[in-house]
C-alpha cells in the first residue's frame, strides 16, 4: 500500500490544525449500509453528541431509521434541526446538561421514559481527555475532572438508562461505552485519562454480567489514533509539547512517528470507529456482550 504523508499546520488554531495521512482508499472501502434500516422504530441516546464520534453516530443511527436523543454539555440544537429536516418521520431531541449531575441524568432519563415508554440504545460516549503531563506534575483537580466525566458520569448514565431498559416492555437494550486503547496500553503522560478508560473497560464487563438477565447487552470500543479532527490534532500537539516520548517538538515529525507505530501506517477514520459501534448496537451482535473491540490499526 502506498502511503503519502501530508502534514499541514494552520498556525495558532489548534482545532483547525491538520496532521493528515492520505492513503489508498481502495483498501478501506465500506459497504453501503444506508438502506439496511437496522434501527428502524428504535430510540437511542447518544452522549457527547457534539463530538466527532457522537455526531457521526447520531447521523448514522438516524440514517438507518432510529429516533435519537442528543445529550451534551453544549447545545445540540443545530444537529437536531439538521436531522429533523433530513428525517421528518423520526423523532429527535436535544438535551443540554452535565452528565456528572446525577439529578439531571435521572430527570432526563425519566423524561424519555414518560414520553416514549422505551429506550433501545445507548452510545455512552461523553468524555474528557484531560491534561498531558508527567505523573509528578499532574494536578488533583484535573485528575478529578477526568474521573468525574469519564467514570462517574458514564456510570450514572449507564445505570439510569439500564433502569429504563429493565422496566420497559419488552425488557432489553444495547449499550456501547467509549473506552480507549490508552486504557489498555497505559501510555506515559496520560495517567488520568488512561486510568479512567481502564475503568470504563472493567465497568463494561461487570455491567454486562449484571444486566444480562434483563436482556441488556453492554460492550465497549477502544480506539487509537483516529482522525482527522480535534482529538487527533490535540494529541499530536500535546505529544510535541511534552517532547518526552517522541524526542521532538515539531508536530509534523511527531505525527509521522505516531503513524509509524501503527502497523497499517495510517490513522483510523471516524467511520471506522462508528461502524463497529453500530454493529454492537444492532441485533447483528445479539449474542455479544462484555466485549471490547480494539480499533487501532493493529497496535
Which role does the model predict for each range below?
Residues 34-69:
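Canonical Rossmann dinucleotide-binding motif of NAD(H)/NADP(H)-dependent dehydrogenases/reductases
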Residues 158, 196, 204:
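Active-site helix of classical SDR
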Residues 264-295:
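C-terminal substrate-recognition "lid" of short-chain dehydrogenase/reductases
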Amino acid at each position: 500500500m502506498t502511503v503519502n504523508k501530508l502534514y499541514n499546520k494552520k498556525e495558532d488554531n489548534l482545532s483547525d490544525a491538520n496532521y493528515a495521512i492520505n492513503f489508498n482508499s481502495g483498501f478501506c472501502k465500506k459497504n453501503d449500509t444506508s438502506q439496511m434500516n437496522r434501527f428502524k422504530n428504535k430510540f437511542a441516546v447518544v452522549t457527547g453528541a457534539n463530538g466527532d464520534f457522537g455526531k457521526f453516530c447520531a447521523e448514522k443511527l438516524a440514517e438507518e431509521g432510529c429516533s435519537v436523543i442528543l445529550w451534551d454539555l453544549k447545545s445540540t440544537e443545530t444537529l437536531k434541526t439538521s436531522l429533523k429536516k433530513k428525517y421528518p418521520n423520526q423523532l429527535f431531541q436535544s438535551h443540554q446538561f452535565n452528565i456528572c449531575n446525577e439529578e439531571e441524568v435521572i430527570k432526563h432519563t425519566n423524561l424519555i421514559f414518560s414520553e416514549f415508554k422505551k429506550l433501545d440504545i445507548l452510545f455512552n460516549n461523553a468524555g474528557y481527555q484531560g491534561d498531558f503531563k508527567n505523573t509528578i506534575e499532574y494536578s488533583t483537580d484535573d485528575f478529578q475532572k477526568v474521573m468525574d466525566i469519564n467514570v462517574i458520569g458514564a456510570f450514572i448514565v449507564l445505570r439510569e438508562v439500564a433502569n429504563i431498559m429493565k422496566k420497559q416492555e419488552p425488557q432489553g437494550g444495547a449499550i456501547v461505552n467509549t473506552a480507549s486503547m490508552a486504557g489498555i496500553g497505559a501510555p506515559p503522560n496520560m495517567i488520568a485519562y488512561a486510568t479512567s478508560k481502564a475503568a470504563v473497560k472493567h465497568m463494561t464487563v461487570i455491567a454486562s454480567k449484571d444486566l444480562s438477565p434483563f436482556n441488556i447487552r453492554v460492550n465497549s470500543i477502544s480506539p487509537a489514533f483516529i482522525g482527522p479532527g480535534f482529538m487527533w490534532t490535540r494529541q499530536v500537539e500535546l505529544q510535541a509539547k511534552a517532547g518526552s516520548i517522541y524526542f521532538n517538538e515539531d508536530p509534523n515529525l511527531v505525527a509521522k512517528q505516531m503513524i509509524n507505530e501503527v502497523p497499517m501506517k495510517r490513522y483510523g477514520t471516524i467511520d471506522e470507529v462508528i461502524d463497529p459501534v453500530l454493529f454492537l448496537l444492532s441485533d447483528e451482535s445479539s449474542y455479544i456482550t462484555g466485549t471490547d473491540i480494539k480499533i487501532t490499526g493493529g497496535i
